[in-house]
Amino acid sequence: MLGRTPGNIQTIRPLKNGVIADYEVTERMIRNFLKKVNPKKGLASPRVIICVPAGVTQVEKRAVIDVTREAGAREAYLIEEPMAAAIGIGLNIFEPEGNLIIDIGGGTSEIAVISLGGIVKTSSFRVAGDRFDTTIIDYVRQKHNLLIGERTAEEIKKKIGAVMDLEEEECIEISGRNALNGLPRDIKICSSEIVEALGDLVQQIIEEVKVILE
């Protein structure tokens, strides 16, 4: 809904950067999820597993467990995002070998080495999808004098997002408001521009990977 609501409606993010930003709204959101998976009254409340960034504090973890139980879960368990990502792609996390996981989420990115069923080393930092979107917004405004919203920035990222030059350039047409006169305007933007826009952020991720591998 970001970028698509009228001016009299506010879009709220219950979770931000991987942790609870609004406790009450988070509780309502989880309660709604539980009703969808368990609509009939009288059935036992479900057990819930929630992913959290590897770098969150014990206080932040406790808040997630508490809000999930208050929302109606019988039991709440946490799993660190890199571990969930490893399981999701089919890795045998119990093998006596190291697996490097890079999980670029919305608010945070997670880099972890996993072996023998545990996380050996990890780094959690706030350079991820949301930062990509705001960086694209700033780039388009500065280079093209065009004002776009988060919805358009995400569309650009998904359709032509790249971190290195492609063999064949990809371009799309986007709409926005002229920053000089406020009038609607369309422009063509290409993947090479996104490579330029995201270069610094990508380099930050690369540096974090180097630290983990040292």
Model-derived regions, located:
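Nucleotide/phosphate-binding catalytic cleft detector across ATP-hydrolyzing
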Residues: 1-104, 112-214
